[in-house]
From Swiss-Prot:
Cytoplasm among keywords: yes
GO cellular component, one term: cytoplasm
Major location category of this protein: cytoplasm
Name of this chain's protein: Isoleucine--tRNA ligase
Function of the molecule: Catalyzes the attachment of isoleucine to tRNA(Ile). As IleRS can inadvertently accommodate and process structurally similar amino acids such as valine, to avoid such errors it has two additional distinct tRNA(Ile)-dependent editing activities. One activity is designated as 'pretransfer' editing and involves the hydrolysis of activated Val-AMP. The other activity is designated 'posttransfer' editing and involves deacylation of mischarged Val-tRNA(Ile).
Domain of life, source organism: Bacteria
Gene (name only): ileS
Positions annotated to bind ATP: K611
Entry remark concerning the domains of this protein: IleRS has two distinct active sites: one for aminoacylation and one for editing. The misactivated valine is translocated from the active site to the editing site, which sterically excludes the correctly activated isoleucine. The single editing site contains two valyl binding pockets, one specific for each substrate (Val-AMP or Val-tRNA(Ile)).
Length: 1060
């Protein structure tokens, strides 16, 4: 027999500092390399692949970053405990506008001119430094929250090997003819000087108020020339400077309306909305197709056109949902405009420069920023009599997702990946993917795929993966897939090249067939100036994290595709999309099988966290106040993770109190009592009766435990941490507030006794298994408790232990149902006692119970009800003739009015005339009842009837859902004395705690009573009192002078005690 197996359990103190405990656990994990060992012991087993979505290292982490990282940690821990090898490689998204904007702020510069004046090489060096600096902050948060991921070998999208892999992927897409340069309308940020992709666009909408103007365009040709004007609506008056045409729908009817002073052409369905009152139709009606090529006077003559323009064109996209049905066309600033005007050979006129300002020579708006030019333009239209109506229009307008500058839709040459060509493949891959929650698949994400547009890949920026395309003066192009290939093409060794701007820009590729007499620039290819969308970087991580295919190809193949990825819901248009798109473009299949989408984390006040509002919670201070486990539990198990949730100190304090400390206190109770007296050891617990031979209460909690294993296992397999959390919370409450409390007397049993062994063994088995089940969600407190509970042959850490398996033979659904009934009846009885104002410790003569299933309860369970309700006798309600409660009912007019309207008075009268007892019984049994209203049976719900109960004198009654408990309130002298004895026991137990006694300490007890009934109670219940308070002597008298004294004036007694 080992010494370890016979040692008492180490005590878990009653009080615990959770953050301090977590720091100690972190130290132990690192010293003993627990994470590394968890990987070592599963290596060679089945693999479960998880991809770390790389956070953008452009600032310090917020508490919302904890959410996704909790989910990234829970499931790999869970799968590892189930024997899977789960390699967890961290990653950092290093490139892109987020980093550039942050560095610009640090340097006190703004815009591309300032960056180029500062120097691209130095600017990019500062970007690299910024990334590395912020990586440290994320690393600290990751460690503190207990997220196990390999930070030492993290991939970084700025590393040479990663960039080479991205180049390889771009070359694959190029070779398939899916990467093209085109002159298209793209979302464009004038401050950043670059286009954005549609998935970036989706992340930056803000609510703004813009002018909504209706403008007259006088007709200059056609049957209405000189008589009428086209009425055009726009919310972007600044684009009127470049007006080229007016589009109408060919099939819509357009009419002429007059107010007596002028005539306006408007789509017939919009006459009322656009013109208002006072307008009549002249009777002239034209199909849109008839208006084609009618010319008009353009609203501004600030820019020159080099070919004919300013006539009506046809566009099927024109609608009659709002506006006037006539749409102003400025092809430089709208994709639909560009498409329609191109078909008519109309010119594209763009007077707005790359920085978003109008060209300086223009009247009215020269050098003005496009959004602020509206006011001057609208005022000029009004002065010239062209402004028909001006309103303020609140709407959602796209802004740059990083610098928050209003975007323009701008005609610029850009590089596009033709993702529209693989739309059907993307939809097919999505159909195979398991989305959590399921509605995202065909909803938010499916809709995004169905409306797929080509991916605007290029960015006119600096800190990013350079687009690996070199172009000769004659337009020939080469796409390069690696530094090795570039070395061969350029004729120099570039294996150590930093593949970023400006260094890669200096590399030229000579044309071997060029005339050597030509100037150098005419004989070499230079790289195009753009870098690529940062989302392509992160979308390439399945292979680029390994540097594949140039290196580690086997590693990539073994880790593709992923069984699991997870991020916030907005990544449906970000990383989730780029991952699927890149892999489908390159490999013909998606790179993931299961994806979890998380709702956003809000501040406690329900608003988005922001520095401006002062409601940001920093993760490290929060964890050092409440503990990381509390924050982890909130993220994983509080409410629905798929919905927005509010986090704050209040909810975290509640988690600590209701979940973590309730669990810990049960474990502390076990170790305290197991160590009391001679103490219990693992060997002694092993000799406990078999589960099926233990008392009913033990069999019940073990049944609940093994049902819990199944529930939590199934929930986590389906990525449902909320269900797992609810089940665990319920069991923790069952264990602490029912099982432990109901079993307290058995925990006093001496070592080696069957009743004590059964109780201790059952509680140990529950705590051990509960600790295993909670470990993936709250890894700190469970590993701390594990150290106290650990069997001699158990792993050093709970995170090295195996996931528990349910024993179906111990699951007893019938017993679970019976115990649930017992607890419902106890709650009803307690409610009845509270209503009566009677003390909880005052025994009552009897309780009467009316409930389906009560008659079948075994005596042990009936005894539990009696003891919990503190009654001497428990009988069925049927033993009492007549009713113990008088009922009255009346209508709830507020609830009835919502449903019945004008017929409410007749329904209310039917309720008054109904038999109250029958109506209440039906409502409580079925949550619904019928009444006769003018010969028609009307179904009422419970909230539509107000029920008043009046118990008969001497009784208190509580009922719910067809179950009733009635308490007899008549007190005999014997019951009163028993109640006093209970109060005395409470006084002594409180005194034991206050005097610093241990739970197993025996005492000497002296008492003296001035109240006659109290004195009688002490004499009558001396044995019971002594047993409960561990008194080896029970003496009437004053006792030792140095004994601990308690005086109760209420019960007229003085108590003194000291340790025996």
């Amino acid at each position: 027999m080992s010494k370890e197996s016979t040692r008492p359990f180490p005590t878990l103190p009653a009080q615990i500092d959770l953050p301090a405990m977590e720091h100690e656990v972190l130290r132990r994990w690192e010293e003993h390399k627990i994470f590394e060992r968890s990987l070592e012991q599963t290596q060679g087993g089945p693999t479960w692949v998880f991809y770390e979505g790389p956070p953008t290292a452009n600032g310090t982490p917020g508490v919302h970053h904890v959410e996704a990282r909790v989910f990234k940690d829970v499931f790999p821990r869970f799968k590892t405990m189930k024997g899977f090898y789960v390699e967890r490689k961290a990653g950092w998204d290093c490139h892109g506008l987020p980093v550039e904007v942050a560095v610009e702020k640090e340097l006190g510069i703004s815009g591309k001119k300032d960056i180029e004046a500062f120097g691209i090489a130095e600017f990019n060096a500062r970007c690299r430094e910024s990334v590395l600096r912020n990586v440290d902050a994320f690393t600290e948060m990751t460690r503190r929250m207990g997220y196990w991921v390999n930070m030492d070998e993290a991939y970084r999208t700025m590393d040479r090997e990663y960039v080479e892999s991205v180049w390889w992927a771009i070359k694959q897409i190029w070779d398939k003819g899916l990467l093209v340069q085109d002159y298209r309308i793209s979302p464009y940020c004038p401050r950043c000087g670059t286009t954005l992709s549609d998935h970036e666009l989706a992340q930056g909408y803000e609510t703004v108020t813009d002018p909504s103007v209706y403008v007259r365009f006088p007709l200059t040709s056609g049957p209405l020339a000189g008589q009428a004007a086209l009425l055009v609506w726009t919310t972007t008056p600044w684009t009127l400077v470049s007006n080229t045409a007016v589009a109408v729908h060919p099939e819509v009817d357009y009419v002429v309306a007059t107010d007596g002073s002028e005539q306006l052409v408007v789509a017939e369905p919009l006459v009322g909305a656009a013109l208002g009152d006072g307008w009549t139709l002249t009777g002239q009606r034209f199909k849109g197709a008839e208006l084609e090529r009618w010319t008009y006077q353009r609203p501004f003559e600030l820019v020159e056109f080099d070919s004919p323009a300013h006539f009506v064109v046809l566009g099927d996209y024109v609608t009659v949902e709002d506006g006037t049905g006539l749409v102003h066309q400025a092809p430089a600033f709208g994709a639909d405009d560009m498409q329609v005007c191109r078909a008519y050979g109309l010119p594209v006129v763009n007077p707005v420069r790359n920085d978003g300002t109008f060209e300086e020579h223009l009247d009215l708006v020269g050098d003005e920023f496009f959004k602020t030019a509206d006011a001057a333009l609208v005022a000029d239209l009004k002065d010239r009599g062209l402004l028909f109506k001006h309103l303020d229009y609140e709407h959602s307008y796209p802004h740059c997702w990083r610098c928050h500058t209003p975007l323009m839709y701008y005609a610029v040459p850009s590089w596009y990946i033709k993702t529209t060509a693989i739309k059907d493949q993307l939809l097919a891959e999505n159909a195979k993917t398991n989305w959590v929650p399921a509605n995202v698949k065909d909803g938010r994400y499916g809709e995004w795929l169905r409306n797929n547009v080509d991916w605007a890949l290029s960015r006119s920026r600096y800190w990013g993966t350079p687009l690996p395309i070199w172009e000769f003066p004659d337009g020939r192009r080469i796409c390069v897939g690696s530094l090795k290939e570039l070395s061969e093409l350029s004729g120099q060794d570039l294996s150590d090249l930093d593949p970023h701007r400006p260094y890669v820009d200096d590399i030229v590729i000579p044309d071997p067939d060029a005339d050597p007499s030509l100037p150098l620039e005419q004989r070499v290819a230079r790289r195009v100036p753009e870098v690529i969308d940062v989302w392509f970087d992160s979308g390439a991580m399945p292979f680029a994290q390994w540097g594949a295919p140039h290196r580690n190809q086997e590693k990539f193949e073994a880790n593709f595709p992923a069984q699991y990825i997870c991020e916030a819901i907005d990544q449906t248009r970000g990383w989730f999309y780029s991952l699927m798109a890149v892999s489908t473009l390159v490999f013909g299949r998606s790179s993931y099988e299961n994806v979890v989408c998380l709702g956003h984390i809000l501040a406690e006040d329900g608003r988005k966290m922001s520095k401006h509002l002062g409601n940001i919670l920093e993760p490290i201070p929060v964890m050092d106040r409440h503990g990381a486990d509390a924050l982890r539990w909130f993220m994983a198990a509080s409410g629905s993770p798929w919905m927005p949730r509010r986090v704050g100190h209040t909810v975290l304090e509640e988690i600590v109190r209701k979940v973590l400390l309730t669990y810990y206190n049960s474990a502390s109770f076990f170790t305290l009592y197991a160590g009391a007296g001679d103490g219990w050891s693992h060997e002694q617990l092993a000799d406990a009766p078999a589960p099926q031979d233990r008392p009913l209460l033990d069999r019940w909690i073990l049944s609940e435990l093994h049902s819990l294993i199944k529930t939590v296992d199934d929930a986590l397999e389906r990525f449902d941490t909320a269900l797992a959390g609810r089940a665990l919370t319920t069991f923790i409450d069952d264990l602490s507030n029912w099982y432990v409390r109901r079993s307290r007397r058995r925990f006093w049993a001496g070592a080696g006794t069957p009743e004590g062994a059964a109780a201790f063994a059952t509680l140990f088995e529950c705590l051990e298994t509960l600790t295993l089940l909670m470990a993936p969600i709250v890894p700190f407190i469970t590993d701390h408790v594990w150290q106290a509970l650990r069997r001699p042959d158990a792993p050093e850490s709970v995170h090295l232990a195996s996931w528990p398996k349910a024993d179906e033979s111990l699951i007893d659904p019938a017993l679970s149902e019976q115990m649930a009934l017992v607890r419902r009846l106890v709650e009803l009885g307690r409610a009845a006692r509270v209503d009566s104002g009677q003390r909880v410790r005052q025994p009552l003569a009897r309780a009467l119970v009316g409930a389906p299933g009560f008659a079948e309860l075994p005596e042990q369970l009936r005894a539990q009800i009696a003891e919990e309700l503190n009654v001497v006798q428990l009988d069925p309600l049927s033993v009492v003739g007549g009713d113990l409660v008088d009922y009255s009912v009346k209508p709830n007019f507020r609830a009835l009015g919502k449903r019945f309207g004008k017929t409410t008075p007749r329904v209310a009268q039917a309720i008054r005339e109904a038999d109250a007892k029958t109506l209440v019984e039906r409502l409580r049994a079925d949550n619904a009842a019928t009444v006769d209203v003018d010969g028609e049976q009307v179904v009422l719900s419970a909230d539509e009837v107000v029920v008043t109960e009046q118990p008969r004198e001497g009784w208190t009654v509580a009922s719910e859902a067809g179950e009733t408990v009635a308490l007899d309130l008549e007190l005999t002298p014997e019951l009163r004395r028993a109640g006093v004895a209970r109060e005395v026991i409470r006084l002594v137990q409180d005194a034991r705690k206050s005097s610093g006694l241990n739970i197993s300490d025996r005492i000497h007890l002296w008492w003296s009573a001035t109240d006659e009934m109290t004195a009688q109670a002490m004499a009558e219940h001396a044995e019971a009192i002594s047993s409960e308070v561990l008194a080896v002597s029970f003496t009437e008298g004053t006792g030792d002078a140095d004994a601990y004294e308690v005086v109760s004036e209420e019960f007229g007694i003085t108590l003194r005690l000291r340790k025996a």
